[in-house]
Amino acid sequence: MKGSRIELGDVTPHNIKQLKRLNQVIFPVSYNDKFYKDVLEVGELAKLAYFNDIAVGAVCCRVDHSQNQKRLYIMTLGCLAPYRRLGIGTKMLNHVLNICEKDGTFDNIYLHVQISNESAIDFYRKFGFEIIETKKNYYKRIEPADAHVLQKNLKVPSGQNAETQKTDN
């Protein structure tokens, strides 16, 4: 698709309805009003994706302080089916990864993926995410209800450096 433009734009009170509509079409789960209220507060961690000026996807994240770590949780990252495999998801995920890299204080980035969503699992694996656990009955009212937790570590564990990791093989 030569000449096509992929851009990311802020989520604002003026376009939050677009985000709601996209999420209703893309995801098998419903998000409540609190989700959308919170999305308006996260700034650069929520973006609409535009393909030639048409909103076709979105990414919404939040900072999570759990397990004595600073983590970034990808609440949603998705794109309308006809616009998949055009680099839109990659642009959204790279945006989030760049934020984490610039910040420098995140330990990891993680998300939940329905166990049957092999294309999403493959997508995240290309970026270095790994399945770290499977949560039984994570989803309500959708089948399969189980979700994989995918995580990408952003910091080398303390006490290790690149040299010791190489020699441990």
Curated annotation (Swiss-Prot):
InterPro entries: Acyl_CoA_acyltransferase, GNAT_dom, N-term/lysine_N-AcTrnsfr. CoA binds at residues 117-126. GO terms for molecular function: histone H4 acetyltransferase activity; protein N-terminal-methionine acetyltransferase activity; protein-lysine-acetyltransferase activity; protein-N-terminal amino-acid acetyltransferase activity. Keywords: Acetylation, Acyltransferase, Cytoplasm, Nucleus, Phosphoprotein, Transferase. Acetyl-CoA binds at residues 77-90. Pfam families: Acetyltransf_1 (PF00583). It is found in: Cytoplasm; Nucleus. Coiled coil: none annotated. The modification Phosphotyrosine is found at residue 110. GO terms for biological process: establishment of mitotic sister chromatid cohesion; mitotic sister chromatid cohesion, centromeric; N-terminal protein amino acid acetylation; post-translational protein modification. SUPFAM superfamilies: Acyl-CoA N-acyltransferases (Nat). This is N-alpha-acetyltransferase 50. It comes from Mus musculus (Mouse).
